[in-house]
Curated annotation (Swiss-Prot):
Protein name per Swiss-Prot or TrEMBL: T cell receptor beta variable 10-2
Keyword NADP listed: no
Subcellular location: Cell membrane
Subunit organization: Alpha-beta TR is a heterodimer composed of an alpha and beta chain; disulfide-linked. The alpha-beta TR is associated with the transmembrane signaling CD3 coreceptor proteins to form the TR-CD3 (TcR or TCR). The assembly of alpha-beta TR heterodimers with CD3 occurs in the endoplasmic reticulum where a single alpha-beta TR heterodimer associates with one CD3D-CD3E heterodimer, one CD3G-CD3E heterodimer and one CD247 homodimer forming a stable octameric structure. CD3D-CD3E and CD3G-CD3E heterodimers preferentially associate with TR alpha and TR beta chains, respectively.
Species this protein is from: Homo sapiens
Principal location listed in the UniProt entry: membrane
Stated role: V region of the variable domain of T cell receptor (TR) beta chain that participates in the antigen recognition. Alpha-beta T cell receptors are antigen specific receptors which are essential to the immune response and are present on the cell surface of T lymphocytes. Recognize peptide-major histocompatibility (MH) (pMH) complexes that are displayed by antigen presenting cells (APC), a prerequisite for efficient T cell adaptive immunity against pathogens.
A biological process from GO: cell surface receptor signaling pathway
Gene: TRBV10-2
UniProt keyword Membrane present: yes
Amino acid sequence: MGTRLFFYVALCLLWAGHRDAGITQSPRYKITETGRQVTLMCHQTWSHSYMFWYRQDLGHGLRLIYYSAAADITDKGEVPDGYVVSRSKTENFPLTLESATRSQTSVYFCASSE
């Protein structure tokens, strides 16, 4: 029996100016075995240029994994190792854990901004 990891994926809503950016993250919760590939989806309802993936570990603040300034433009954050992102459309910014490890057990947040 493989070691199981818990990935807590939270819904994060950020406000930009006087309007809110609707963010949908899925799945909301994810349990997987070590070594498996996991993709967390992030979809925004506004056409914001910037999108972000963060993780929050027990006893720590938010840490940036990756961000995107526009479709097809992504860059590494503070803790990018073991993750891959893509952004072919303005609305979507999936985060993939290439081979899930215990150290990636965390709460994950996606956000967007103008």
